[in-house]
């Protein structure tokens, strides 16, 4: 089953994306480079728990 996750900006701006991932095939924490509109550049987004 796909679980909802939150991708939080590593720049410390507080910006985040929400997405889903299959925990069976990807058991580790997701890290991906995406655009942060607050910082106006690409930064690393890290997976956190969606409350």
From Swiss-Prot:
Domain of life according to the entry: Bacteria
Gene3D superfamilies associated with the record: Ribosomal protein L33 (2.20.28.120)
Record-linked PROSITE patterns: RIBOSOMAL_L33 (PS00582)
Record flagged with keyword Ribosomal protein: yes
Gene Ontology process terms (BP): translation
Assigned protein family: Belongs to the bacterial ribosomal protein bL33 family.
HAMAP family membership: Ribosomal_bL33
Name under which the protein is recorded: Large ribosomal subunit protein bL33
Organism: Neisseria gonorrhoeae (strain ATCC 700825 / FA 1090)
Upper lineage: Bacteria, Pseudomonadati, Pseudomonadota, Betaproteobacteria, Neisseriales
Underlying gene: rpmG
